[in-house]
From Swiss-Prot:
Keywords: Endonuclease, Hydrolase, Nuclease, RNA-binding, tRNA processing. NCBIfam families: rnpA. One of its GO terms (molecular function) is tRNA binding. It comes from Chelativorans sp. (strain BNC1). The keyword Hydrolase applies. It catalyses: Endonucleolytic cleavage of RNA, removing 5'-extranucleotides from tRNA precursor. PANTHER family: RIBONUCLEASE P PROTEIN COMPONENT. Belongs to the RnpA family. Its EC number is 3.1.26.5. This is Ribonuclease P protein component. It comes from the Bacteria.
Length: 120
């Protein structure tokens, strides 16, 4: 084992009601994606949902956008996520043309800069 801290793996948002609940939270619009976040008020690991609307391309393009976002969260942004917080990332078509380094840096920067205040 290395001396690094244990990496926290975010859970997944899977139900429509969970995605809709996060819509009531903070929205951060950007060129590559829309980031919505909502503090749950517990100490459970963060949860992430990734979606791309049908306005964006065809199924192949939407799936590629989802895969790029999922990988950016896995390799870079997961460490920046606050416990007890739900995140929804709505991908945009511009992700297809953006360099992966720029995508993961932008995602990490937005998540790091907007950790919700802890309640209680």
């Amino acid at each position: 084992m290395s001396g690094r801290a244990q990496r926290q793996h975010p859970g997944r948002l899977t139900k429509r009601a969970e995605f809709l609940a996060v819509q009531r939270g903070l929205k951060l619009r950007g060129r590559l994606f829309l980031l919505e976040l909502l503090a749950r008020g517990d100490d459970d690991p963060p949860r992430v949902g990734i979606t791309v609307t049908k306005k964006v391309g065809n199924a192949v393009e939407r799936n590629r956008i989802r895969r790029r976002l999922r990988e950016a969260v896995r390799v870079h942004a997961a460490d920046d996520m606050a416990t007890g917080t739900d995140y929804v990332i709505v991908g945009r078509r511009e992700i297809l043309d953006a360099p992966f380094g720029a995508l993961k840096d932008e995602l990490s920067r937005r998540i790091r800069g907007n950790k919700p205040a802890r309640t209680g």
